[in-house]
Amino acid sequence: MNTTFEATNSKSRVLIVDDNSRFARSAQLFLEQTGNYFACALNDPRRALETARSFKPDLVLVDLIMPQADGLEVATQLEADWALHEVPIVFVTALITPEEARNGRRINGHRVVPKPTRGFDLLKVVEENLPCCSGT
């Protein structure tokens, strides 16, 4: 299936890759309701590279543990793609505690967010990791 995404002017684009459709959809809706983001929720990590090439995200949120492909595999594919290798990736997982996340826990150099997470906490992480907003 070939998906075309509309231009979104100044809105930042966030790709959410998570096999939990409820989490992915609620994160998408929360980010879009701020008015600052255009988000795409994807439940099949095997389609992450193809979707990212089409969607052209400014940031990718990816679940670490998924049955079809894990988040590390998705990150490796994105980092190997010349057009996507600089896109920030944030892992979302139930494998760490909120305290570990607050202490700056990283996996393969990527920020990690604990699951479950509140919408405003997720928004803060998105804002901190977007190239336009992070001050880097």
Place the predicted regions along the sequence by residue.
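Two-component/phosphorelay signaling modules centered on CheY-like receiver
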Residues: 21-40
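Conserved Asp/Asn-Gly motif in the active-site loop of CheY-like receiver
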Residues: 42-46, 119
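Non-catalytic signal-transmission and effector/linker regions of two-component phosphorelay proteins
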Residues: 1-15, 118-136
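Active-site residues of response regulator receiver
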Residues: 63, 93
